[in-house]
Amino acid sequence: MLVFTGDINLTDWYFNAGFGIGTRIANGFDPFRKLERNANDLWVGNFEGVASNVTDNGGFAGEVFRVHPKVLQNLNHFDVYGFANNHAMQHGKEAYQQTFNAICGYGSKCFGTNKQKSVVMKHQGRTVSFTGMCLRIDDFTDEPSYWYNPEYKEIEKELKSLPVDAFKVLYIHWGNEYINRPSSAQKKFAHWLIDIGFDLIIGMHPHVLQGYEEYNGKYIFQVSQVDKYNVTT
């Protein structure tokens, strides 16, 4: 079983600095401890936050949306994480790379960066690929280290690099916040992604559910922060 979630943030936010989830994790809390996870499941999420001991920001801005990587070391992490989202670069390029290295170092597979747009793996005898991109404006940098707003030809090129027999999943950070339905542009783009060969689209960012659509026998989901969808490949 493939189990998908949306954005996962393990840091304190602006409004709960000092008592948010990042602080609780630093004090020994594991937010994943009660998840019902079976041995044959593959859990996938989008890592939206920063785990680094460096930041380009000063003062309060340097503390929020960031935890020390050691804080996350003992969590019961997801199997696979995407790293293409509009908060990933909030503390700079070095912090982004530290985050990626730390999470991958703790045993999770990672995707969605400029250097590693996709990851391919075997699951229950089936080849599965995960590709990540972000279409949201990045307020923190003009040169994101994640796969940002690619051209159609770049997407087609990445798709062609994946194994022909793979079940191809696309994680895409997009959409308007707090709007409970996708835009016509999102729908059109998602249909094109299915038409060129992706098997499943998992969208996130708006902070609310935007429903799902079956298109040509394949599915397009718009998930929120911790929503869960099970898919049997």
Question: Model-predicted segments: where are they?
Answer:
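N-terminal catalytic scaffold of extracellular/periplasmic and nuclease hydrolases
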Residues: 1-84, 90-92, 168
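Structural recognition of the beta-strand scaffold that forms the well-ordered cores
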Residues: 3-4, 41-46, 79-84, 110-112, ...
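Binuclear metal-dependent phosphoesterase catalytic core
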Residues: 5, 37, 116-130, 218-233
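Active-site environment of divalent metal-dependent phosphoester hydrolases
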Residues: 11-14, 51-54, 84-100, 115-120, ...
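Binuclear metal-dependent hydrolase catalytic cores centered on His/Asp/Glu-rich metal-binding motifs
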Residues: 13-33, 62, 66, 123-171, ...
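Active-site-proximal segments of metal-dependent phosphoesterases and phosphodiesterases across multiple
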Residues: 53-74, 166-199
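Conserved beta-sheet core of the metallophosphoesterase superfamily
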Residues: 78-80, 184-233
